[in-house]
A protein has these predicted regions:
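Alpha-to-beta junction loops
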Residues: 46-56, 100, 123, 153-157, ...
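Pocket-flanking alpha-helical
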Residues: 38-69, 85, 186-188
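Periplasmic-binding protein-like
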Residues: 110-119, 221, 229-249
Length: 250
């Protein structure tokens, strides 16, 4: 049996490559098709060109189905790309100076995740009731004028930038909170100071999934694919290769 699976080049296709030999032992051959965009893997799955894809999280898939009238579902959650706090001009949080500048992603969801991480790390405190759902449901937030911070003892300055531009800006910032998928190709794993908790809300909501056409999630070979991707062998591969910028789902 051959399974044709669409995937983003990193880390998804690399994780599938690690799973391929284990699946081959079960008589399942993986044909991995790499995509550089986030629309074609779903349209190709919907039209039957692919058996599955592996590149997105559930909120993105839910939104895609709603906008395109497709009926694609998750067959399982595999990994999570945590937001991490990376050292720029300042080497560690112990050296956090008054007025330090911290870069965060400009979009509401990821910027919100960044502020929640900074709260977990004791850098600042958000107003009561501000949680992940609050940021996910927010239309647009201008973080430069954001008034949801209750306590900011070090008077840190929050600088919101396009998520993809944060790694390049890191040398000019004291710290930055960066998405795993941008941190990996930037080669900044050695500057990682802390990440979101793998058992926390964001990890559950934004876990990357294997998606299939509705009804296919019970196909034996799809079940085998998900089982292998969640196996100890593949989990170890993820932990060793990505050094914390990609984590297996807890």
């Amino acid at each position: 049996v051959t399974l044709k699976v669409g995937a983003s080049p990193s880390p998804h296709a690399e994780i599938l490559e690690a799973a391929a030999p284990i699946l081959a032992e079960q008589g399942i051959e993986l044909d991995i098709v790499e995509f550089d965009d986030y629309v074609l893997p779903n349209t190709a799955l919907a039209d039957g060109s692919l058996d599955a894809n592996y590149f997105q999280h559930q909120p993105y898939l839910t939104n895609f189905n709603a906008e395109n009238g497709t009926d694609l579902v998750s067959a399982g959650s595999i990994h999570y790309e945590p937001l991490g706090l990376y050292a720029g001009k300042t080497a560690s949080l112990d050296e956090l100076a008054d007025g330090a500048v911290i870069g965060i992603p400009a979009d509401a969801t990821n910027g919100g995740r960044a502020l929640l991480l900074l709260q977990d790390l004791g850098v600042l405190t958000l107003k009561d009731g501000i949680d992940l759902d609050y940021f996910r449901n927010a239309e647009d937030i201008t973080f430069s004028e954001y008034d949801g911070i209750a306590e900011n003892p070090h008077n840190v300055q929050i600088e919101a930038l396009e998520a993809a531009n944060l790694p390049a800006a890191l040398p000019d910032l004291d710290f930055a909170v960066i998405n795993g998928n941008y941190a990996i190709p930037a080669g900044i794993a050695d500057k990682l100071l802390a990440t979101e908790d793998a058992a926390g809300d964001a990890a559950q909501v934004f876990a990357n999934i294997v998606a299939v056409r509705a009804g296919d999630e019970t196909r034996p070979e799809i079940e085998a694919l998900v089982e292998v991707l969640k196996s100890d062998e593949v989990k170890s591969f993820i932990e060793e290769k990505y050094e914390g910028s990609v984590l297996p789902v807890a």
